[in-house]
């Protein structure tokens, strides 16, 4: 009965309204709205009530109706319901709607313009969705709206000027979108607005002065944009403003003194702009100010004395400016409330004043990256509220006081890179809240105190590079939260404490480069989270404990250079290895099959052990393997066929084993192979011709085997080969003429074989031969080719123990580079010229016909008799032949001279310029430039001049310290880059230069720019290098060029592209340093030399060019100009050594990596006069939050969390590359490994989303 009554009442109420159309309209509209909203089928449907069976829609989830009895929908609150789908235009039909909240869902698509029909709307909340498109300008008609919050979406385009019509607006929140364009000056008409939130967009242009009219404004934040211009003084009129945040923009000029008139201001952040000038004293008048952050600008002068009187100030952050002076003794004289004082990187000098102890409320003190000297004052340890103390990168000295025990709230103690010495006080045990202890690169000595184990909150300990001695305290095992223990490069002795196995959170354990002994404790097997185990360069011994098999998360292990033995099987529990190094130990037994389970393993080093058995076939499963070193073991059997699947192999070293069988023909399928070392084994049979398909081979060492047959002509295919060692085999037959094609050979050893025939004259074509030419202990006959004397770099020549005849060519004696010469035990004769006297007699023994210094003097009479014995007829014949030969050569030289002179003048013409239209002629047009095979066809001088309009400026695409670069589009459709070298000499006539450039031209790598050819004109002083053209310019252009044509490109240079470029750069440098023999030092790595092809792949240019030019210039040439164009990239040691090394290249590469991530130039003004990019990155990387966030180029934002992590990892690698000491920098190969690790794990974060 009761339900029936209720139903009748409900019907009467509705019929009494007389408004069935209105009811049906709102009901129908709600049902239509629902059609565009999608709920998660895995969860309870929050809109299950929204259906036509339930016409009481006022009770539906999120629906609110008015209380007038008309049942009109006035509010829809669907926030946080996990909705997907889109916003339906039907929302615009709720005529009486006052409040619409669709925030915190996953809605996509545009904001419908139909929402502008909601003329009664007072609040519109669409924030935290995935909405796209532009903000509809029609929203400017919502004149009753008070709160408009549509941020945290994917919205693009400009902020509509029509929003200035919303005169009742109190809150406008458009943060965290992708909005562009200026802040509309029309927003200055919003006189009632209280909150204007525009941060984290791409807004640009100046801040409109009209915003000073928004008199009710209490919050204005436009941080994380691209705003420029000056801060308008009119903002000083905002007397009600409490929060002003303009951080991370490009604002310039001085800070207006009028900002000191905002009497209610509590928070002011202008950090990370380009502001300059003095800090206005008027800011001290802001009596309510609690936070002042002016860090990372170009501010100068001293900190105003008045700041220390601001009684309400809690946070003062002035880091990374160009301030001067020292900390005043008046600090905190009238302000004991200061909690955060951050003055890092402000060029402070002098000592830390004892008066700092007056800041009794101080929680964070950061004075790092300055020039502070003296000791840490005892009074500093009276700041008992301190949680963070950063004093690193100064020149502090003295000891660490035991009074540090007073700082019982301390969580971060960072003192690295100072000159602190003495013992680490045992009183540190009182710091029970300490989480991070960084003391590395100081002069601490003595033992690490046992009491450190009482600091039970410690997560990271880094004491690398000190003089700590004694044993590692077992008490460290009590640190249950520890994830980093880095004690490398100290003087620690004794065994590894078994108690370290209790540190179950350890990720990195690095105890390398000490004097540790004993065995590895079995308790290390409990370190289940361990990722890196570095124990190399110690004296550890014994078997590996079986428990290590439990370390399934290891990615890097290095136990090299110890005395360990037994089996390595306990290390094979992980299938996540990236690098595995146990070289130089005494490991025995067979190589475990399980090593093949780490499919991302890049480098496997097992050399110099006592491993036995066969090479595991399972290694063929490691498709990422690039280096395999099993040298100096006792391995037997054949090389397993499965290794043919490791297509990325670049280095194979199996030297000094007992491997047998023929050399596998399938090795020829490893197209990336650059180094093959199979020396001192038991390989037999002839060389497979397939092996010579490995055209990237740089080192081929097969000596000490039983290989036979002849050396095939196909060896000439190995044009990149630097080292060829076939010593101590059974090769026979003659030396192939194709050997002369190995023009990059640095070392050639063919001794102790059975080679016959004459030494081919083509051997003289090996102009890069330097280390050795050893043909000893063979059966070579005939004369020594005089062409050997042209090998101007050769240091060792051994032709001993052959059957050579004739004289020793005088040109050999003229070889200035030759240090070792041995032609003993041949059948040589004649008189040695005086040039040979610099070698000992042993070099010529066993040649009965030889005489002269350093051998016995020639018998003049016997010599004359022998000459007479030739007969007068012979002498006449020989003289006649010599005379005719000399005349013939003279005629040939004269003819060639006139021909070249004729061709030259036909090429350059006779006008005032070298490149007139008359320069083309039938003969000249067919004279090609030198080229290295990279071009489609011969490139002619005239082609280049025509394509560039005689090197006109309109075709110039770049310039630098070495010259200008032009783009040349040739008639054959090919595009090349032409570099005009600014050098006064005719470089191409310099044989040394010509040889070096030809060598560089033969270098091929996917991340190096190909040098295609060169030419010069002596009369015009022009030297041209022809390079492969890179369509997308340099990474410098993309990061720093302000031309409008690049604006769209900047948006395309996303994090994925930048990371790929960073890896490509590192791979190019690694190739130069580790895969070229001899290694090539680039000398001028910078972002403008990192070029991008059409696929945005990185190619390093100008490699080797600086060295070639500086070594081939006259004494008046200032070679340092090669570094003048690279300021900001130069390693610090170059300033005093003036010597470029691989480690100085690594430093320059580190700077480029920082540039790629931060988007800043190495000399960016944000660093200040006394701080460089390295210290700036280091300063911000070591702190969390906004300071770290500013390291990432704003153009990359927003990034996903794991992308930000990857960016920070790249910066950490860059910091390692830019260590002050070259010895502490990684090799380019190690840096490349680290970057590849970041790149290969870049998608891991997607799985967590």
UniProtKB/Swiss-Prot annotation:
ATP binds at residues 957-965, 979. The chain crosses the membrane at residues 877-897. Induction: Repressed by wounding. Residues 19-876 are extracellular. Changing residue 160 to L: In sgn3-5; altered CASP proteins localization in Casparian strips. Its EC number is 2.7.11.1. One of its GO terms (cellular component) is plasma membrane. Changing residue 1101 to R: In sgn3-8; altered CASP proteins localization in Casparian strips. Its main location: membrane. SUPFAM superfamilies: L domain-like (SSF52058), Protein kinase-like (PK-like) (SSF56112), RNI-like (SSF52047). The modification Phosphothreonine is found at residue 948. Belongs to the protein kinase superfamily. Ser/Thr protein kinase family. PANTHER family: LEUCINE-RICH REPEAT RECEPTOR-LIKE PROTEIN KINASE FAMILY PROTEIN-RELATED, LRR RECEPTOR-LIKE SERINE_THREONINE-PROTEIN KINASE GSO1. This is LRR receptor-like serine/threonine-protein kinase GSO1. It comes from Arabidopsis thaliana (Mouse-ear cress).
């Amino acid at each position: 009965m009761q339900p029936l009554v209720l139903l009748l009442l409900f019907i009467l109420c509705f019929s009494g309204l007389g408004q069935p159309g209105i009811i049906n309209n709102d009901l129908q509209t709600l049902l239509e709205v629902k059609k565009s909203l999608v709920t998660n089928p895995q969860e309870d449907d929050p809109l299950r009530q929204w259906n036509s069976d339930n016409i009481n829609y006022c009770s539906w989830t999120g629906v609110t109706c008015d209380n007038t009895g008309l049942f009109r929908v006035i509010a829809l609150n669907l926030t946080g319901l996990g909705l997907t789908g889109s916003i339906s235009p039907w929302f615009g039909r709720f005529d009486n709607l006052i409040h619409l909240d669709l925030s915190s869902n996953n809605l996509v698509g545009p904001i419908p313009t139909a929402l502008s029909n909601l003329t009664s709307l007072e609040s519109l909340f669409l924030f935290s969705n995935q909405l796209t498109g532009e903000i509809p300008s029609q929203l400017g008609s919502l004149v009753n709206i008070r709160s408009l919050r549509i941020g945290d979406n994917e919205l693009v385009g400009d902020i509509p000027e029509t929003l200035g019509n919303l005169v009742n607006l109190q809150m406008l929140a458009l943060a965290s979108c992708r909005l562009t364009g200026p802040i509309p000056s029309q927003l200055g008409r919003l006189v009632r607005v209280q909150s204007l939130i525009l941060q984290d967009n791409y807004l640009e242009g100046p801040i409109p002065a009209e915003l000073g009219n928004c008199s009710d404004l209490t919050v204005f934040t436009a941080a994380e944009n691209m705003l420029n211009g000056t801060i308008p003084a009119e903002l000083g009129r905002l007397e009600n403003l409490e929060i002003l945040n303009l951080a991370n923009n490009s604002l310039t000029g001085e800070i207006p003194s009028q900002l000191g008139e905002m009497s209610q201001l509590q928070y002011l952040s202008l950090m990370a702009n380009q502001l300059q000038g003095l800090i206005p004293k008027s800011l001290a008048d802001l009596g309510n100010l609690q936070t002042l952050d002016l860090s990372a600008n170009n501010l100068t002068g001293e900190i105003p004395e008045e700041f220390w009187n601001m009684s309400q100030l809690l946070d003062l952050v002035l880091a990374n400016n160009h301030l001067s002076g020292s900390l005043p003794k008046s600090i905190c004289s009238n302000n004991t409330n200061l909690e955060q004082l951050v003055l890092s990187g402000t060029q402070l000098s002098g000592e830390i004043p004892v008066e700092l102890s007056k800041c009794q409320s101080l929680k964070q003190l950061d004075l790092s990256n300055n020039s502070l000297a003296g000791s840490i004052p005892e009074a500093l340890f009276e700041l008992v509220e301190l949680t963070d103390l950063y004093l690193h990168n100064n020149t502090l000295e003295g000891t660490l006081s035991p009074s540090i025990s007073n700082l019982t709230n301390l969580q971060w103690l960072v003192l690295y890179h100072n000159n602190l010495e003495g013992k680490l006080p045992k009183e540190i045990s009182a710091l029970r809240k300490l989480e991070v202890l960084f003391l590395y690169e100081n002069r601490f000595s003595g033992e690490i105190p046992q009491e450190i184990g009482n600091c039970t909150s410690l997560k990271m300990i880094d004491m690398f590079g000190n003089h700590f001695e004694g044993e590692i305290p077992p008490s460290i095992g009590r640190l249950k939260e520890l994830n980093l223990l880095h004690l490398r490069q100290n003087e620690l002795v004794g065994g590894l404490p078994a108690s370290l196995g209790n540190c179950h959170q350890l990720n990195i354990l690095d105890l390398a480069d000490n004097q540790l002994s004993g065995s590895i404790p079995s308790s290390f097997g409990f370190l289940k989270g361990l990722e890196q185990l570095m124990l190399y360069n110690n004296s550890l011994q014994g078997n590996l404990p079986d428990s290590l098999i439990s370390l399934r998360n290891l990615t890097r292990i290095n136990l090299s250079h110890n005395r360990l033995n037994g089996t390595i099987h306990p290390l094979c529990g992980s299938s996540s290895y990236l690098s595995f190094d146990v070289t130089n130990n005494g490991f025995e037994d067979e190589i475990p099959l399980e090593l093949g389970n780490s499919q991302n393993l890049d480098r496997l080093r097992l050399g110099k052990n006592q491993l036995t058995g066969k090479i595991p076939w399972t290694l063929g499963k490691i498709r990422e393997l690039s280096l395999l070193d099993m040298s100096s073991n006792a391995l037997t059997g054949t090389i397993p066929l499965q290794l043919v699947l490791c297509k990325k192999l670049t280095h194979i070293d199996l030297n000094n084993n007992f491997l047998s069988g023929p050399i596998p023909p399938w090795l020829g399928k490893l197209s990336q192979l650059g180094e093959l070392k199979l020396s001192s084994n038991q390989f037999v049979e002839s060389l497979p011709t397939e092996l010579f398909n490995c055209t990237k081979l740089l080192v081929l060492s097969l000596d000490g085997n039983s290989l036979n047959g002849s050396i095939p002509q196909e060896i000439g295919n190995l044009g990149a080969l630097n080292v060829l060692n076939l010593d101590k085999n059974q090769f026979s037959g003659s030396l192939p003429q194709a050997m002369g094609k190995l023009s990059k050979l640095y070392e050639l050893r063919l001794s102790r074989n059975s080679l016959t025939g004459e030494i081919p004259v083509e051997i003289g074509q090996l102009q890069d031969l330097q280390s050795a030419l050893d043909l000893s202990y063979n059966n070579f006959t005939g004369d020594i080719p005089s062409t050997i004397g042209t090998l101007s770099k050769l240091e060792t020549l051994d032709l001993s123990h052959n059957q050579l005849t004739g004289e020793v060519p005088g040109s050999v004696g003229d070889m200035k580079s030759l240090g070792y010469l041995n032609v003993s035990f041949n059948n040589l004769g004649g008189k040695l010229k005086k040039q040979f006297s610099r070698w000992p007699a042993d070099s010529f023994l066993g040649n009965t016909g030889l005489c002269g210094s350093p051998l016995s003097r020639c018998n003049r009479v016997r010599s004359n008799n022998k000459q007479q014995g030739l007969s007068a007829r012979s002498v006449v014949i020989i003289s006649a032949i010599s005379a005719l030969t000399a005349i013939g050569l003279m005629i040939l030289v004269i003819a060639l001279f006139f021909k070249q002179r004729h061709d030259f003048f036909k090429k350059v013409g006779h006008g005032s310029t070298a490149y007139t239209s008359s320069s083309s002629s039938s003969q000249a047009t067919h004279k090609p430039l030198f080229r290295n095979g990279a071009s489609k066809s011969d490139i002619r001088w005239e082609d280049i001049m025509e394509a560039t309009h005689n090197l006109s400026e309109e075709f110039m695409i770049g310039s630098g310290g070495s010259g200008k670069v032009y783009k040349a589009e040739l008639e054959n459709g090919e595009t090349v880059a032409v570099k005009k070298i600014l050098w006064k000499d005719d470089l191409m006539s310099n044989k040394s230069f010509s040889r070096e450039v030809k060598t560089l031209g033969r270098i091929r790598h996917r991340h190096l720019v190909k040098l295609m050819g060169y030419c010069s004109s002596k009369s015009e002083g022009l030297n041209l290098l022809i390079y492969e053209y890179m369509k997308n310019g340099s990474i410098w252009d993309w990061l720093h060029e302000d031309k409008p044509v690049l604006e769209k490109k900047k948006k395309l240079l996303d994090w994925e592209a930048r990371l790929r470029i960073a890896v490509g750069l590192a791979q190019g440098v690694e190739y130069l340093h580790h895969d070229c023999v001899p290694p090539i030092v680039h000398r001028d790595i910078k972002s403008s030399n990192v070029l991008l092809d059409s696929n945005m792949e990185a190619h390093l240019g100008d490699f080797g060019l600086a060295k070639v030019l500086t070594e081939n210039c006259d004494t008046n040439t200032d070679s340092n100009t090669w570094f003048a164009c690279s300021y900001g990239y130069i390693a610090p040691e170059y300033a005093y050594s003036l010597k470029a090394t691989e480690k100085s290249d690594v430093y320059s590469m580190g700077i480029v990596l920082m540039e790629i991530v931060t988007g800043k130039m190495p000399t960016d003004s944000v660093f200040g006069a006394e701080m460089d990019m390295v210290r700036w990155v280091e300063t911000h990387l070591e702190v969390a939050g906004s300071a770290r966030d500013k390291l990432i180029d704003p153009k990359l934002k927003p990034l996903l969390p794991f992308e930000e992590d990857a960016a920070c990892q790249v910066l950490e690698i860059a910091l390692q590359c830019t260590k002050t000491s070259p010895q502490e920098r990684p090799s380019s190969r190690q840096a490349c490994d680290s970057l590849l690790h970041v790149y290969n794990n870049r998608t891991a974060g997607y799985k967590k989303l």
